[in-house]
Amino acid sequence: MPPKNLSEELFKPRFKHPETSSLVRRVRHHHPFLIHAALGGEHSVGWYRTIDRLLWAWRGLSPQEIVEVLSRIAASTSEHTDERLLDTVMGYRGGNWIYEWSKQGALWQQKASQNHDEQQAGHCWLQAANLYSVASYPHLKEDPLAEQAQLLASRAYQQATLLLPGELKELEFAIPGGSPVSGFLHMPPDARPPYPTVLMCGSLDSLQSDHYRLFHDYLAPRGIALLTLDMPSVGFSAKWKLTQDTSFLHQQVLRQLENVAWVDHTRVAAFGYRFGANIAVRLASLETHRLRAVACLGPVVHRLLTDTDLQDRVPDMYMDMLASRLGMSGTSDGTLRTELSCFSLKMQGLLGRRLPTPMLSACWANDPFSPEEESRLIVNSSSAGRLLKIPTSPARIGFDTALRDMSDWLLAKLTL
């Protein structure tokens, strides 16, 4: 008798769970055109989610595997929440986004459990973690199937890091007024503690298990540790809502690093990408004496939060994600836009004045989420600012070169 497919054991077909695109009740714009961002993916006609092939491939997924899973989703004839959108199959079954990516993740998990070579097994576990993360994407609240996929991603990631180079420690941080949060401290294999450390401030559509490549390829070779933390309302930080004090959780963690023996708390920098840059730059303003430097990638700190025309041009999924993080899934566009404007660091008075903290901001031309002036606003607010323009073609080479440049810059600031 053939062994049961692992995905069938983990997730049996179910039909009573809400479909992801139906969770946020907003007016849909159904953009009849293609939206492309080098970081942030491609929003094609016919898809609810933004298809972020570059970032998924950079994390380790093969382009062929990405196409294979997307093809299974696109070919489904099952009932959809919106028949115009391929990735809105209702129920946990073939063709459903979470089902298909989780099924692929389970295949790699099975490969990992059958592989007796530690290094190869570790890479299989990492592939599984990446696939489970895509299954959960964009990680909206009140999506129980996505939450299960997040849990599987975290477990697979912890299994992977047990077998791959370097060491990972899960750290718990007490947070005033609520539940503690957990972060992953990634420690470089060829260095001695206490380590200079980068505090990761990720995008709103990422999990902290998504950042292994940044650590392994860019920070670890430079002897730098990476501390990851889930964004408010996601993963291990799910009990915390995103508020105008966006940096609250990261600030509490930053203040407690002097109690973490493996971290040199006098040599800490922050790395923020997309909305995470909002947190990183805010920390530069509020915790100047605790941060050596801040590096930002495709930052979202002002324009997208205040410009309604720009908000109308980004994918519905992104605006849904913002509404979900803010706990505003059932409010009108007007109310959401008013609230978003309060998240602008310029409106908060935290940008536009000179900060002593060195800040680097990297950007792409014609980025729909982060115009170049967003990065200029950041670097002009630092007494030691630097603007880095990333070539859009070839995209992967430009991305890799930028990350190496940013890592060298961080190392220089951390070793002054």
UniProtKB/Swiss-Prot annotation:
NCBIfam families: PRK05077.1 (NF003460). This is Esterase FrsA. Pfam families: FrsA-like (PF06500). Keywords: Hydrolase, Serine esterase. Catalyzes the hydrolysis of esters. It catalyses: a carboxylic ester + H2O = an alcohol + a carboxylate + H(+). It is an enzyme of class 3 (hydrolase). GO terms for molecular function: carboxylesterase activity. It comes from Erwinia tasmaniensis (strain DSM 17950 / CFBP 7177 / CIP 109463 / NCPPB 4357 / Et1/99). It comes from the Bacteria. The lineage of its organism: Bacteria, Pseudomonadati, Pseudomonadota, Gammaproteobacteria, Enterobacterales.
